[in-house]
Amino acid sequence: LITSLQKKQKGLQNEVSKKRREANQLNARIDKLIAEEIERARKRAAEEARREAAARKKAESKEGKSSSASRGTTKKAAPLEAYSMSKADRELSGNFAGNRGKLPMPISGPYIITSHYGQYAAEGLRNVKLDNKGIDIQGKPGAQARAIFDGKVAAVFQLNGLFNVLIRHGNYISVYCNLSSASVKSGDTVKTKQAIGQVFSDATDNGRTVLHFQLRKEKEKLNPEPWLNR
């Protein structure tokens, strides 16, 4: 009996180690892609600021206002470092934030949240904790992952044979993981509730169909549940 229990404990420990290793691998990839997307957004905003400054200068020159600079009446443009988002991104961010608590679930059909945001005890093991950077949502086989808001696909990547999708909503980013297929590609514009891929169903686990979903505000990890209309 003791040997049997020890084997069971060893099996659970191996399972937890594998789960933690895969989660760390996934989160490292997500963090890297988000950092790259933030840098791209910064460059877009800086370019927009440069274009606006050039347009203002041209307009002032045409109106003969260039001499106003010597009188100290010309407004100084904000430094480029102040621009982290383009005008379109700022508007989209405001709309997204205004829908906190009203966003649709990122999975189609009936569902249950099987793992919540934050630390939780590993089942069957004492003093062992795991840290969920998002939430796990179990649906029915054939369930689709769907965009929670209008946005643009920032990245689509594969890891361990499964697809993962990042969608940018201004400075918010929603992340959809554990997909068997993806129906969008990087750069695509998506609408609220648009299907973006099929959630993987594990044939070795009675067709268990689980979407791992994360929400970020740039690099900050957010608890998705208060944002969703459950």
PLM feature spans:
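Alpha-helical oligomerization segments with coiled-coil/rod-like character
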Residues: 1-70, 79
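Short proline/glycine-enriched turn/loop segments at secondary-structure junctions
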Residues: 15, 125, 201-205
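Long, low-complexity, acidic/serine-threonine-proline-glutamine-glycine-rich intrinsically disordered tracts
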Residues: 50-110
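Short glycine/threonine/proline-enriched tight-turn/helix- or strand-capping micro-motif at secondary-structure
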Residues: 81-101, 114-147, 170, 210, ...
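Generic structural motif
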Residues: 105-115, 143-153, 193
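Residue-level recognition of beta-strand microenvironments
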Residues: 116, 156-157, 199-202
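Zn2+-dependent peptidoglycan hydrolase active-site motif and core
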Residues: 130, 147-182
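Conserved, short, structured surface segments that act as functional micro-motifs
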Residues: 165-168, 186-230
